[in-house]
């Protein structure tokens, strides 16, 4: 009994570990883009981002869904006490990832020229070749991460991601700076900078391999006795593909929002402007606005990553109460985190960008793009957590329908709007916002129909919206007061800190949290008693 009680907060522990690592990774990512943007400029960053977005798309085509499939299958086998099957799942997955990684890297390496021309920027081919080894490395890393996530052990994943990001940051800047100082062309400088991504990924893989060799399995198999049966490698491979292919298709569809931008922004804007202007607009949008848009995902990704194996384990154990508890807690956390991020980013887009990037002209261009894009943070978060829930409950095909609907909306809206010269690049974030709204709405309807009809999204969002609105008044008031005193940077930092503090105080005042919400955290009893003493809870 005590053992089960100890394991109760495992979901939230995994979320916290991944959340901390993701915040660090995202901060490193932003810090990487700031000096890189200063080195390469908007045009050089367009080559960097074209290569990186292409890599992301091919990575998703090659392997997206397989880490989720591994974590779900390992989690279910672990609950049933099947140690030997867990080992076979891992070996089968590594072999599959090795093949897929080799194919993907070959496509990028030998097809770089054609792919770059297809995206309207032939000079990006050098950057595409430089990042190509990353695809093979990340395939192997993903198989090991899926194994650990199936054990609901998020620590190796978290550490490896931090190592990768740190390596990318340090080596990317060093190589990019060296290339610029030695007078190499801007496209070659972008290739040197993006090579740091591959080297950083290699460092993370070395850590994961060491962690796998040191991992002790015995502690995880306490829920059932091993009956000695082990599925064949062929059956495991079939199950991996049955679970992962729909997940991969939905992930690819989701990534197509950025892929559509990669293919359309330069090609459409070139019709009524120069190629250099089009490349600069793409580089500005993807480096500044899109980078900040993805920053809040550091808080959401850990929830969905921890949700899939936890929900799979609850279903395998036929524990309906825990299943509902895990799902409702995940959705509630997602809503509470994403709403203030969306509102705050929309209101403070220019000060936040100005805090991070020194080029005033680039900040002025990107600020309205980020303001338009920011509401999509909420819809993206809902989409992420509902997709994880559907996939964990073996409704992997449902998110594909949502994604297809959203991609059609994105393509139509972005292309139609960007074709209007007076709208131009603004059409890209508008199309993305429409796309995420459609995908999130359709996905949530599937969750209500197939997973749980007890989630009331409107009830969940009312108090966070009210708290965010009240906190936003404080944000704007404090920022404007300090800005008028001649300290815009200080004003941005202080107003953001005050807003975060005020938001959670308002949530407690509005009685958004109950005792059960607090008890799922490690040391929940102590936290609850402290909150009662502060008169924030009864």
Residue ranges and their predicted role:
Residues 1-28, 84, 88, 227-254, ...:
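N-terminal membrane topogenesis motif
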Residues 113-131, 346-377:
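Interfacial segments at transmembrane-helix termini and the short loops linking adjacent helices
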Residues 10-68, 98, 105, 109, ...:
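Signature of the first transmembrane helix
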Residues 36-57, 186-191, 235-243, 266-294, ...:
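Interfacial/gating helices of multi-pass transporter permease domains
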